UniProtKB/Swiss-Prot annotation:
GO cellular component, one term: plasma membrane
Highest taxon, organism lineage: Bacteria
BP terms from Gene Ontology: cellular detoxification of fluoride
Compartments reported by the entry: Cell inner membrane
Protein name in the entry: Fluoride-specific ion channel FluC
Organism lineage: Bacteria, Pseudomonadati, Thermodesulfobacteriota, Desulfovibrionia, Desulfovibrionales
Known regulation of activity: Na(+) is not transported, but it plays an essential structural role and its presence is essential for fluoride channel function.
Keyword Zinc-finger: no
Function: Fluoride-specific ion channel. Important for reducing fluoride concentration in the cell, thus reducing its toxicity.
HAMAP family xrefs: FluC
Pfam family, one: CRCB
Keywords linked to the UniProt accession: Cell inner membrane, Cell membrane, Ion channel, Ion transport, Membrane, Metal-binding, Sodium, Transmembrane, Transmembrane helix, Transport
Catalytic activity as recorded in UniProt: fluoride(in) = fluoride(out)
Length: 125
């Protein structure tokens, strides 16, 4: 059990570093006028979660321990829902209502689309 927790923690550290790197890269490319970095990480995270879940759990291509490491460890640290809510709150406080609605709708709709794309791809594996 302790070994499993260690692997989950290491995967969590990797997920955190991947989130930091990718969101920073996106912000460098697209700017910081909109929470693009968080949006990209959340949408990609939804896709990867769907892919790992479908290919790993439903298709039995990953052992239970590997799924725990990937989904709980890496994906738990990689996705940034709390940051999404915090940044949305900032848009609300700044009275940027159109940007707030765009952010909420954009990430929610594309997040669902990415999840189902990942599930579909996982079914093909």
């Amino acid at each position: 059990m302790l070994e499993k927790l260690g692997f989950i923690a290491l995967a969590g550290a990797a997920g955190t570093l991947a989130r930091y790197w990718l969101s920073g890269l996106v912000y460098d490319v697209l700017g910081r006028d909109f929470p693009w970095g968080t949006a990209v990480v959340n949408i990609l995270g939804c896709f990867l979660f769907g892919l790992v879940w479908e290919a790993g759990a439903e298709r039995m291509l990953l052992r239970t321990e590997a799924r725990a490491v990937l989904l709980t460890g890496f994906m738990g640290a990689f996705t940034t829902f709390s940051t999404f809510i915090f940044e949305s709150g900032g848009l609300l406080e700044d009275h940027r209502y159109l940007a707030l609605l765009a952010n909420l709708g954009f990430q929610t709709i594309l997040g669902f689309a990415a999840l189902f794309a990942g599930l579909a791809l996982g079914r093909l594996i």
